[in-house]
Amino acid sequence: MPNPPASFEELIALPPSFKIVIEDPRSSTPGLGNVLWIQAAYGDRAPEIWAGLKPHVLTVTRGWSEAYGLFLDGEADMVLSYTTSPAYHAIAENDHRFAFAPFKEGHIAQIEVAGILKTSEKTDLAKRFLAYLTSVAGQKLIPTTNWMYPVVDLGADLPTDFGAQSKPEKLLSVDEAQITAQSRTWIDAALQALE
């Protein structure tokens, strides 16, 4: 796609034949991230954005794999995915056709975490694993196995095709207390707008 939309408003303004695939926020972390993204970017205007997206949504899938598969099969023009998806195609498949579409309003980050359960019987082993996971050696594995940005600056050790991909210029966030208090309402409003 030579000129992808650069905002949700630009996406909404496209002809209804322009289709996207998104994930269900009740069963998919990218789907939940989409709800938070629109809420963070548009606040009280979020329902208006969801209503505008409705004619463009080909389907809402249970998870990312189904959505991305439909996109790869040519069923939709765009898919809600990770900004690192193009790096996967470039590195693993030597396919440079895919790109991340930066949106002017910014992007929400999906941060994956690791921790130790209180009930762990192997706390020392878990601590050693977490120390390794957050070390440079452990983080060198993340870009090309989990296809996410590392939590440490790898400098020249970041694969060239991974580092060459566009990254969001503006990251949005939603206050944790607000997510706890409002996420169910936001999810329900999004799903209702898409019915």
Predicted regions located by residue number:
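A ligand-binding cleft/hinge motif common to bilobed small-molecule-binding domains
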Residues: 72, 76-97, 146
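C-terminal capping/gating helix-and-loop segments adjacent to ligand/active sites or protein-protein/ligand interfaces
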Residues: 139-195
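Substrate/cofactor-recognition hotspot
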Residues: 129
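Extracytoplasmic ligand-binding site segments that recognize negatively charged/polar headgroups
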Residues: 1-78, 89
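Solvent-exposed loop/turn segments at secondary-structure junctions
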Residues: 1-2, 26-29, 84-87, 105-108, ...
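A bilobed periplasmic-binding-protein/Venus flytrap-type ligand-binding module shared by bacterial periplasmic
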Residues: 1, 39, 110-122, 141-144
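Periplasmic-binding protein-like
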Residues: 18-27, 50-54, 60-61, 65, 93-118, 132-154, ...
